[in-house]
Amino acid sequence: MSYSPLLGADRRAGEPSSGLASSTSIRDTLSGALNSTKAYLQPFTPASPYLGSNGVNGHNEPSRLLSDVAPQLMTTRMMAAVTNSNTALGLTPDGQRRARLLLTPGFSITSPARSLVRIGGSLIQSGIGRGPMNGITSNELFVLEESDRILATAARDLDLEANADAQLGARSAIEASKSKAAEPSVSLLRGFQATIPSSTEGRQRRRRVRALASGFEDGPEGPTKLGLKAMGDKARGLMVEGVDAEPVSAFQAREQRHARRNQASRILSRAKEGSRSSAIQLEELERQLREIEREQGDVGVRRSLIDSEMAAVDDKIKVLENIKAGLHKKLLGLREEELELNDEHEGVGELLAVQKHLRAMPGGPAAAANAAASGGATTSQGSSRRRKGPLFMPSEHDELPSGVAFMTLADHSAPITSLDFTEPYGTLVSASLDETVRVWDLASGEEVGRLRGHVGTVKCLQVEDEVCITGGSDHSIRIWDLTKVENFEARLTMTASGELRARRRSPDLNRSPPPVADESMDSIKIRDGDTTAGDGDEEEVRDEFDPCVKRLEGHSKSVTSLYFDDNCLVTGASDKTLRQWDLNTGQCVLTMDILWAISNPTSSQAISQSEFGFPESPSRKASSSSILGATRPDLSSRDSFSVLNNLSGAFSYPTPPYADGSWEMYQDFVGGVQFWGYALASGSGDGGVRMWDMRTGQAHRTLLGHTAPVTCLQFDEHHIISGSLDKSIRIWDLRMGSISDTVRYEHPVTALQFDSRKILAATGENGVKLFNRTTLQHGSLTLNGHTSPVERLRYMDRYAVSGGKDCVVKIWAL
């Protein structure tokens, strides 16, 4: 291919010109481009006879340039037709020259390469310009491919220095392209030239030339051969053509060896002499040098093409990875939907079983109809903490934005210590350090009344349907009927106002001391004017209206956790014991001593920490002199009695700082209890999670993993999930007996609840933490939320309640 200064400068040219809106502007632009081309080519006029004012066929310079760009277009027949049409239209010679391109159908300045290819193809198909020697050559294809930059270069008014710089830059770019590992782009024609099989023929030709020059192939009978291939084939056991299979004598074999050796020596000596004498001609060496440089360029082009293909493959891989990630996300969404449907199926199945059971009983159809009319609330069996399936909620709940607190209950004057509710938009009971237990109507957000009777703080409570059980720092457990709270509050208000009127009428009543609360169940007296007083006839009134229906005593210290289901209640207290109660009789039927379980581990309890995913280490086995130590004692060691002596005293543990920097002494030795059937799980201040058999009262397994007191736990058919002051939530697989996952936070965990899809936790921050068990993603409920760390929470389906140190209770839509 011939190299012209125009094409050399064009490799340095700038961006292609933008499209023009009208034919007038197109003609002006092309005219200016042709004039610029004249000025650009004038310095090179003496150097080439093809760049004069008159060129081939008598055309002037612009016509010659256009003929080079579109040889199939600028033929004699086409030019004559254009000239005749211009004459008929009365165009000037300059206009005629511009019209030669602009009047051609399908030509566009914005995409000249495409236009020229289309016009050339149409001309070939029509037979115009076709001859025995005519056709589209590689040079013409290259020009067509580079026409965008040719026109852009011609449209610029460049001076001689700029032209020289452009030419030098183009040559530098060509030289740099040979050394670069990859080019940003390779033309189609150049890539074809570099990859055709004939591009490697020069290498074989040069080998033959060197062989001839060195004497290997200059024999009178053709190329001289050493028989290397025959020896190689024979060594591999192949049949060698032309070799006599008859055995030869030792003398003949020796003579053949001598002959071959002499022949090889002569050939090698001639080869060495030939390489030293450089018998190859100068023209041949220059040709070989050009071939090598071209092949080096071809290697660079092929490398660029391979790099481009690899980059394209990488892009496709990224796209496929994005598609895979999207499909994986959809798969996780389907998994969540499947789990939700499983829970719904189980819940509906339970309701159906209850309905069938009611219908099978005497008077069953009426009872089933009443249960169905009540919305299914009375048909639920078991604790609501294990209840699955959809809940009955108003349709307005779907209109609430998820993750936003839409209700605030703010009558408490101290941090919330415990809370629970019956169902969404039902009844909520909350306890606080202000030593009050308040009952709320979640449909209106108003306080219904209070549960009066405990002296001190209520530390734990549970609500099921219309029954509430509370445990407090006064060592007692009380059972409440929530249906009586509102009427009892009204009676207290009426009694208090009536006694006040009586005092105003009687001076003796005004001199009486202020009433105080009596701890006995035989009478209820006025405390700060809140409750009624009386004995005798008042006893009957108390039995009828008092919401406290029973009081259970047995623990010697604060009751810190409880769980009840049906007629069975289990409580845990700071006296390091667990007690099982019969709610029908109010009697304690079983006492389980945690200290005894620590000091007397059974054979089934003696489970190594490595079995649960924790490696055995001296630091974990070393006994500690205090529960405040950083290491946990070996519960199966005989040396742990010193630790038990410390545990037998008053228990306290400093909590890690919360998000607001506050901390306190944690004194609840039993952080959480839950049972199902005869299986009981408890979390205690020594960091252990124990599994108890309620038939024998023995702890048959201890799950070790937490390094601080366990504050909360919950379990289902397959997992126990526990939270601790060590800032972690641990998920225990009951089937494998090991930790399946650990979720860590920056602050202590004080409360949690989970289902098959998510875990909600209070982790010492202002927001409620949400962990998706399917996607393993973390979230937080903060919008319109608490202003101090959250400490208690409870949720059902898409309805959650939380209480914090800011003394308020927040209601959330999940």
Swiss-Prot record:
Topological type in the membrane: Peripheral membrane protein
UniProt-listed SUPFAM superfamilies: WD40 repeat-like
Pfam families reported for this sequence: WD40
Protein location: Mitochondrion outer membrane
Keyword field contains Coiled coil: yes
SMART domains named among the record's database cross-references: WD40 (SM00320)
Region of interest (Disordered), residue spans: 1-24, 365-394, 499-542, 608-631
Keywords attached to this entry: Coiled coil, Membrane, Mitochondrion, Mitochondrion outer membrane, Repeat, WD repeat
Xref: InterPro entries: G-protein_beta_WD-40_rep, WD40/YVTN_repeat-like_dom_sf, WD40_repeat_CS, WD40_repeat_dom_sf, WD40_rpt
Annotated WD repeat ranges: 411-450, 453-490, 554-591, 659-702, 705-742, 744-781, 785-814
Coiled coil (UniProt feature): 270-303
Main location: mitochondrion
Comp. bias (Low complexity): 365-383
GO CC, one annotated term: mitochondrial outer membrane
CDD domains: WD40
The family this protein is said to belong to: Belongs to the WD repeat MDV1/CAF4 family.
Function (record text): Involved in mitochondrial fission. Acts as an adapter protein required to form mitochondrial fission complexes. Formation of these complexes is required to promote constriction and fission of the mitochondrial compartment at a late step in mitochondrial division.
Protein name: Mitochondrial division protein 1
Encoding gene per record: MDV1
